Every structure is written in C-alpha cells, then in structure tokens.
Curated annotation (Swiss-Prot):
It is a single-pass membrane protein. Substrate binds at S197. Pathway: Cofactor metabolism; retinol metabolism. Its EC number is 1.1.1.300. This is Retinol dehydrogenase 10. It is an enzyme of class 1 (oxidoreductase). It comes from the Eukaryota. It is found in: Microsome membrane; Endoplasmic reticulum membrane. The lineage of its organism: Eukaryota, Metazoa, Chordata, Craniata, Vertebrata. The gene is rdh10. Keywords: Endoplasmic reticulum, Lipid metabolism, Membrane, Microsome, NADP, Oxidoreductase, Signal-anchor, Transmembrane, Transmembrane helix. GO terms for molecular function: all-trans-retinol dehydrogenase (NADP+) activity. Its main location: membrane. Belongs to the short-chain dehydrogenases/reductases (SDR) family. The keyword Oxidoreductase applies.
Length: 341
C-alpha cells in the first residue's frame, strides 16, 4: 500500500512539474543578479565565448577569461574593460543626479582577469584553476565553452586530431568542474554552464569526433545535474546549452538543402548568446536554439532509423558537412603548398 501511495504522489509531482514549466513559459521568471559574482569563461578569446564575456560584463559580473590564445583573450578583456568604464560613467551620472544608493550599482572595483590555458591538458587546467583561486577567489559561475572541430572524414582524420577534439570539447568539462565544484558544494552555491551543440543530441555524417565529444558533454552534464540533486545541493544550478549551427566561421561552408535553408538559417552569434543568457539567468536547466531542435530530438528518439535517414536526405542534412570538410581540406592543402611541405 505504501508504494501505491508513493506512486500517486510521484504522479502528482510530475504533473505539477508540467504546470510549473508551462507557467515559466507563459510568464518569464525574473533574471537573477550576477553583479559582483566571479564568472569564469573558457574559450573567451573569440566567438561565443567573447560574446558571453561581454554579456556578463554588462551585468556587472567579475570576469575570469581563459583561452589558449593570449592575444585574442586580452582583446576580449579590453572590450570588457570598456564596458566597465561605461558603467562607471553611468553610475557617476546617477550619483550626480541625486539617485538613491539602490539605483546606483558599484562597478569601479571590478577587474577582468585573463589566463592563458589549454583546457585540453589536465595539468594546465588544474594549475590555472589554482592560480584563479589564489589571485581572484571562489568561482560562482563556470561556463565551459571552449571547443574545436577537426573537419575531416573519419578515415582521413589523424588520430591526434580526434584525441584533441575529445580532450578540448569533452574532457575539459571534467577537469574544470573537478577544479571548481568542491567549493560550490561546500557553500551550496554556484552555477555550471555546459555549451554543447545540437550535434550532441543528434548527429550527421562526417563529424564523428565532434558529435562524440558533444554527446559526451550532454551525458556528462545530465549525470552531473542528477548527482547534485541526489546530494541535495539545490543551490548549485546547471544549464545545458545546445544551439543549432552558429554563424561563427567554425563550420563555414556547412549547408543544408537550399530550399530549406531560408527557414533554418545558421544562427546569428548575438542571438544565440542572448537566448543562452536568458536561460542561465533564470536557472533554466536546458536551452535548445531554435526551439525546433526540441522537436527534432524527440522525433529522432521515437522514429525508426530509416525514417530519420529519409528526413535527413529531404532536408539535405545527411551531407551538410561535406562542403565544410572540402573547404577545410583545401585550406590545409594550400597551407602545405605555401610552406613547401
């Protein structure tokens, strides 16, 4: 009898979860404040990582930027400093206009910290994380964004590039989380954001290593979320970001069927980041952009494999990566010819 009562209770909780989800969809929750919080972003030197840094800077977060390219990372940091200066000027103007203390949020003591780190190397992650703890303090929000793509068919891809893709795109999430999660758990306070991809939910031909790495991120993130729930660490939030193809140049040349592309074009980076920020700041567990990706993922789970293949071929998604791979191969050959290899 006890298990029967528990079954009805669980059923009620499941239905209530649907009600809450619908309510959040109809009435967007208020964004939480990250002002003064230490937010660490990997792969901050370019692309989505840079845009995430600028968005968090506008919200007065204290930023720690990691990238393997120190020059591009410093360029991002300078953009962040420019935003901080604008916020300081706005605060000064408000004070001059006799604004109340609540209306003026301090920003003048904020700094942005840059670290050159190869997240694909465990030792580099752990040593850099130790420097961050010593020089900056405890990290509140960890945004795992760094990623690479090899751009080769499986049988043509050097083993070293496959390993590199897995290390940077997937294994790095393990190292950074192990470095900063203990303090979050001690305080029951923090937020871990995993930037994966729609190719971590469904796959296509020609990017086996990339898909495997992103599927790994999705599995890692979901298991971590369950582990935090099992440990009753409700103060630590997690957000999984799964965007469709983003127009950052990472997959330049990738094309679906030309008749379909106007209805499903590559995402603008700014739009992708703004949607992700909405999810992060409202503690949303997962965000797929565009929303159509939710439907595609569901259909892939319930349809027969041959039906999925038919859909891929209709959309031109079965070989959408082939032009991208051809461009990468041509660029590699041109570089080798230029260098006399």
């Amino acid at each position: 009898m006890h298990i029967v009562l528990e079954f009805f209770l669980v059923t009620f909780k499941v239905l209530w979860a649907f009600v809450l989800a619908a309510a959040k969809w109809l009435v967007r929750p208020k964004d939480k404040s990250v002002a003064g919080q230490v937010c660490l972003i990997t792969g901050a030197g370019s692309g989505l990582g840079r845009l995430f840094a600028l968005e968090f800077a506008r919200r007065r977060a204290q930023l720690v930027l990691w990238d393997i390219n120190s020059q591009s990372n410093e360029e991002t940091a300078e953009m962040v400093r420019s935003i901080y200066r604008e916020l300081e000027a706005e605060d000064s103007a408000r004070r001059a206009g006799n604004a109340t203390e609540e209306e003026v949020q301090p920003c003048c003591n904020f700094q942005v910290y840059t670290y050159t780190c190869d997240v694909g190397k465990r030792e580099s992650v752990y040593s850099t994380a130790e420097r961050v703890r010593r020089e900056v303090g405890d990290v509140y929000l960890l945004l795992n964004n760094a990623g690479v793509v090899s751009g080769h068919h499986l049988l043509e891809c050097p083993d070293e590039l496959i390993e590199r893709t897995m290390m940077v795109n997937c294994h790095a999430h393990f190292w950074t989380t192990k470095a900063f999660l203990p303090k979050m758990m001690e305080m029951n306070h923090g937020h871990i954001v995993s930037v994966a991809s729609s190719l971590g939910l469904f796959s296509t031909a020609g990017v086996e290593d990339y898909c495997a790495s992103k599927f790994g991120v999705v599995g890692f993130h979901e298991s971590l979320s369950h582990e935090l729930k099992a440990a009753d660490k409700d103060g630590i939030k997690t957000t999984l970001v799964c965007p469709y193809l983003v127009d950052t140049g990472m997959f330049r040349g990738c094309r679906i069927r030309k008749e379909i592309e106007p209805f499903l074009p590559p995402l603008k980076p700014d739009y992708c980041v703004k949607q992700a920020m909405r999810a992060i700041l409202t503690d949303q567990p997962m965000i797929c952009t565009p929303r159509l990706m939710y439907i595609v993922t569901c259909m892939k789970s319930i349809l027969p494999f041959e039906a999925v293949v038919c859909m891929y071929r209709f959309l031109g998604a079965d070989k959408c990566m082939y032009p991208f791979i051809a461009q990468r191969k041509q660029a590699t050959n041109n570089n080798e010819a230029k260098n006399g290899i």
